[in-house]
A protein has these predicted regions:
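Extended macromolecule-engaging scaffold surfaces
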Residues: 1-164
Length: 164
């Protein structure tokens, strides 16, 4: 009861998928997509993917990948105690959307979640929208570096708490 099945021929033969309709209410997530950024970062998607891949090699299972947001770059770093450390900086355009001191100067990401979000983008540039430490970050693609963020794919990542 409540099952739906799909079947089709593909390059690797016949594919079948069955799914079940769940009752209940889906969590309300629409408000997460309407983040009013206090600070945003734009960078090349491929550079960021490669940098995240290299730096996260030393991150342990629950260790956040730290993104330090500077005026014209972001620095990614990860460490495993005193045993291994990695850091790398890439060029970025950082925009403050509020007057005064930036509300967020560093963000902690789960390296796997960040890699998944970046890997799903099919645009040459990525746009991060930050609100405050510990609040969700919206990741979107950019076809033109100075253009508007794409709205066909949006990825929300909850930031991790960074150790002092």
């Amino acid at each position: 009861e409540g099952l739906v099945g799909f079947e089709g021929d593909g390059a690797n033969g016949v594919r079948r998928m069955t799914t079940r309709l769940l009752s209940g209410e889906f969590p309300k997530v629409r408000h997460l997509m309407d983040i009013k950024a206090t600070r945003s970062v734009r960078a090349r998607t491929d550079e960021l993917i490669n940098s995240v891949r290299r730096v996260s090699l030393v991150a342990e299972r629950n260790t956040p990948l730290r993104m330090v947001i500077n005026d014209d770059s972001v620095a990614l770093s990860a460490a495993t105690g005193d045993q291994a450390q990695a850091s790398e900086a890439i060029e970025a355009v950082v925009t403050n959307h509020v007057d005064g001191e930036p509300t967020i100067t560093a963000a902690g990401f789960n390296p796997h979640y960040l890699s998944d979000a970046l890997g799903a983008l099919d645009t040459p540039y990525v746009h991060f929208s930050f609100t405050a430490p510990g609040k969700p970050c919206l990741v979107t693609g950019l076809n033109d570096f100075d253009g508007k963020p794409e709205t066909d794919y949006r990825h929300v990542i909850m930031l991790m708490r960074l150790p002092s």
